[in-house]
């Protein structure tokens, strides 16, 4: 599990995320789209790469991380980057990954959903801020050998429930 200090068992954790810069469009040219590597510990952007479009984020991840030497680092990224080639590239440089599985990997998602999650103990946390209450429940399993994804060691199930809190003294 990742801690607030931005390390997992002493390893640095880097989040990769892409954002389109709002209000930066010039004439007919689309707004710039940037892919950034963020240090979980400090919140600092370590490097960023301009990409031609969102579809180009996948190969841009390698260009982004290459100068950072991902050896020993845990890289987190959204579902767009849940690609076998990306996982192999990170592991091939001695890094580790934590990737989200969604419908862009239908077979992998179906495989993971079929695991015996109801038999797995869970842990939950609750955060309250900005008038919302968010409960996250996490379950973890060792990845079965037959899960077809490079170097997968562990799989997690994260469920999030968000409720809006009523201001005191007001009815909804």
Describe the predicted segments one by one.
Residues 27-72:
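Electropositive, glycine- and tryptophan-enriched low-complexity nucleic-acid-binding patches
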Residues 30-33, 84-102:
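A short alpha/beta connector and helix-capping loop motif
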Residues 25-28, 85-89, 109-113:
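Short acidic, glycine/serine/threonine-rich loops at helix termini
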Residues 58, 67-70, 81, 87-91:
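Conserved PLP-enzyme active-site core in the AAT-like
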Residues 50, 80, 102-104:
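Short, ordered loop/turn segments at secondary-structure junctions
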Residues 1-27, 91-94:
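Active-site- or DNA-interface-adjacent structural scaffold in DNA-acting proteins
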Residues 96-172:
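An anionic, glycine-rich sequence signature occurring as long contiguous blocks
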Residues 15-19, 37, 43, 61, ...:
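Short, conserved catalytic/metal-binding motifs centered on acidic residues
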């Amino acid at each position: 599990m990742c801690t607030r200090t931005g390390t997992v068992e002493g390893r640095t954790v880097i989040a990769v995320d892409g954002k389109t810069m709002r209000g930066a469009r010039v004439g007919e040219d689309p707004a710039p789209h940037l892919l950034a590597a963020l240090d979980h510990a400090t919140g600092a952007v370590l490097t960023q790469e301009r990409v031609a479009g969102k579809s180009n984020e996948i190969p841009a991840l390698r260009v982004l991380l290459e100068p950072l030497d991902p050896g020993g680092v845990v890289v987190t990224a959204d579902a767009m980057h849940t690609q076998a080639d990306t996982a192999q590239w990170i592991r091939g440089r001695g890094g580790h990954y934590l990737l989200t599985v969604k419908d862009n990997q239908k077979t992998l998602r179906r495989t993971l959903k079929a695991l015996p999650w109801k038999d797995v103990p869970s842990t939950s946390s609750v955060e309250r801020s900005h008038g919302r209450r968010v409960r996250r429940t996490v379950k973890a399993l060792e990845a079965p050998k037959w899960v077809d994804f490079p170097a997968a060691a562990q799989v997690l199930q994260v469920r999030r429930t968000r409720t809006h809190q009523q201001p005191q003294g007001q009815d909804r």
